[in-house]
Structures are given as C-alpha cells and as structure tokens.
Curated annotation (Swiss-Prot):
<keyword id="KW-0472">Membrane</keyword>
<dbReference type="GO" id="GO:0005886">
    <property type="term" value="C:plasma membrane"/>
</dbReference>
<dbReference type="InterPro" id="IPR023632">
    <property type="entry name" value="ATP_synth_F1_gsu_CS"/>
</dbReference>
<keyword id="KW-0406">Ion transport</keyword>
<comment type="subunit">
    <text>F-type ATPases have 2 components, CF(1) - the catalytic core - and CF(0) - the membrane proton channel. CF(1) has five subunits: alpha(3), beta(3), gamma(1), delta(1), epsilon(1). CF(0) has three main subunits: a, b and c.</text>
</comment>
<dbReference type="Pfam" id="PF00231">
    <property type="entry name" value="ATP-synt"/>
</dbReference>
<dbReference type="InterPro" id="IPR000131">
    <property type="entry name" value="ATP_synth_F1_gsu"/>
</dbReference>
<dbReference type="GO" id="GO:0046933">
    <property type="term" value="F:proton-transporting ATP synthase activity, rotational mechanism"/>
</dbReference>
<keyword id="KW-0139">CF(1)</keyword>
<keyword id="KW-0375">Hydrogen ion transport</keyword>
<keyword id="KW-0066">ATP synthesis</keyword>
<comment type="function">
    <text>Produces ATP from ADP in the presence of a proton gradient across the membrane. The gamma chain is believed to be important in regulating ATPase activity and the flow of protons through the CF(0) complex.</text>
</comment>
<dbReference type="GO" id="GO:0042777">
    <property type="term" value="P:proton motive force-driven plasma membrane ATP synthesis"/>
</dbReference>
<keyword id="KW-0997">Cell inner membrane</keyword>
<keyword id="KW-1003">Cell membrane</keyword>
<comment type="similarity">
    <text>Belongs to the ATPase gamma chain family.</text>
</comment>
<protein>
    <recommendedName>
        <fullName>ATP synthase gamma chain</fullName>
    </recommendedName>
</protein>
C-alpha cells in the first residue's frame, strides 16, 4: 500500500497536469474559432474555382490540347503523396489518422508495382512515415511553429509540386489532410490534385453537345494554363486551413477528455488517501487503547 506521502505527491502531480491540460484546452478553443472561420470561408472559393475549371475543361478533358495538369502524363507509374499533418502532438488521433491513410495508400500502390514518392508537411507526419518510407521521402516542411498558415506558404508547397511535375518526377499527385466537420469529427481525406480532379457539372457533362454556343477569349487552353496552377495552390491552401481547424478541434477534444480524466483520478486518489489516513489513525488509536489496557 502506498504511503500518505506518495499519495499526496501523486495527487499534487495530477492536479498540476490537470492545470496544463485545462490551459491547453482553452488555448485550443480560442485558436479553433479563428481556424474554423478561415476553413469555412475558404471552402466556397476552392469549390467555385474547381467548378469554373470544370466548366472550362468540359470540352478538353481527354483531348490532345488539354494542359498536362488536367490530362496528366498519360501514365500511372510514379505517385507523389503530399501528406499534411501538424508540428505538435497532444491532438488525439489527428496526426496518426492522416499518416495511416497515406501509409495504407502507399502500401497499396507499391503492392501494385508503382513507384511512390512522399512529401511531408508537418513534423508529426514525417516522424511517423520515415519509419517505413525513409527512402521514399523526397521533401519535408514544418508548419512554422504556432504561426497560422497563410497563402504564401501554400504557394511555396504548390510551386514545389508543380516544378517536380514539370521535371517529370511523377505522374500522379495525391494530397492527404483532415477535413474539418466539427470539434469531435475530423475526416482523413485523400484528394488527387494532379491530374486535377474536377467536379462533374452540367457544362462538363454536355460538352460539345450543348445547344449554348460559348466563345472564350482567350481560348479555354490559355485560360486553363493560367488557372490550373492557381487552382493547385488554392487546393493546397484549403487543405492546410482544414488541417489547422481539425488539429485545434482534435486537441481541444483530447485536452477536455484529459482534464476530465485527471479530475476523476484526483477524486479516486483523494478517496484512497482519506481511507489510508483513516486506517492509520484507527490503527494508532487501537495501539494506544491496547497499551493503556496493558497498564
């Protein structure tokens, strides 16, 4: 049985930990509000960009003049996985679930005889994936500590991806991130970004058979050559915003659970402490009474 001193030290330690987890929960809640607003405000722009591109590309997909960012290289041999996680832990399964999705995808591709290359954004994804895919990791970036992600940072990542694609380093690129739904729901997501995965629209479905005659100046090809790289940056930026909100939501939930568990542990240890102290007092009283009777 632990001594009273051990129990007091244990209770003090748990109380100190509870203060830390409570503070982290409050910080995550404050950051979540900003991150959630940014993610929700970014979704319509990213979705509208994809919709505009889908309408423009309706007659070009699969055609000879289609940009390579839209039609791809025509091959499916080398895959680039862009895995976006966080730099910090204590966020529940946020980081591990994204890394697990990317790992399973990589294993499936390698089992099919494909070549896999990995680019990580965030320290935690790098820490997990390099255990198994050290030779496949070709680039890694941190999220810059506690600074909120911004468009220039997303542009750096997108420019690197685009440069590697134009250099012929891969055929298909897939982006891995966590889509924010709510504080308790973040969905690990895989999105193909090269060739661009565009939504099906009425214009794209009708294509050349549409009765509406539309002329573009400049041509669709020229517009797409300009917009597709922008769309790549927008999709990366959206993924980073979704990740930021998901990370804070997961951390807030995890720290709330840790705080409540610490409270339960304090109650349990305090009860044990009181029972142990009562037993010791009772034992001492019995010894005193027994000694008095012996006299």
């Amino acid at each position: 049985m632990p001594s009273l001193k051990d129990l007091r030290n244990r209770i003090t330690s748990v109380k100190a930990t509870q203060k830390i987890t409570k503070a982290m929960q409050m910080v995550a809640a404050a950051k979540l509000r900003r991150a959630q607003n940014a993610a929700e405000n970014g979704r319509p722009y990213a979705e509208k960009m994809a919709s505009v591109l889908a309408n423009l590309a309706g007659n070009l997909i699969g055609g000879v003049g289609a940009p390579r960012l839209l039609s791809g290289t025509g091959q499916d041999r080398v895959h680039l996985l862009v895995v976006c996680t966080g730099d910090r832990g204590l966020a529940g399964a946020f980081n591990s679930s994204i890394a697990r999705l990317a790992r399973d995808h990589a294993n499936r591709l390698m089992a099919e005889g494909k070549t896999v290359k990995i680019m990580t954004v965030g320290k935690k994804g790098l820490d997990v994936l390099r255990r198994q895919f050290r030779d496949q990791i070709i680039a890694s970036r941190d999220i810059r500590g506690n600074k909120p992600v911004d468009y220039p940072f997303a542009a750096e990542i997108a420019d690197d991806i685009l440069a590697r694609f134009e250099a012929g380093e891969f055929d298909v690129a897939t982006l891995f991130y966590s889509e924010f739904r709510s504080v308790i729901s973040q969905i690990p997501t895989a999105q193909k970004i090269i060739p661009a995965e565009l939504p099906q629209t009425d214009g794209a479905a009708k294509g050349a058979g549409s009765d509406a005659a539309m002329e573009f100046e400049p041509s669709e090809e020229t517009i797409l050559e300009t917009l597709l790289p922008k769309n790549l940056t927008v999709q990366v930026f959206r993924a980073l915003l979704e990740n930021a909100a998901s990370e804070q939501g997961a951390r807030m939930s995890a720290m709330d659970s840790a705080t409540r568990n610490a409270g339960e542990m304090i109650k349990k240890q305090t009860l044990i402490y009181n029972r142990t102290r009562q037993a010791m007092i009772t034992k001492e009283l019995i010894e005193i009474i027994s000694g008095a009777e012996a006299l």
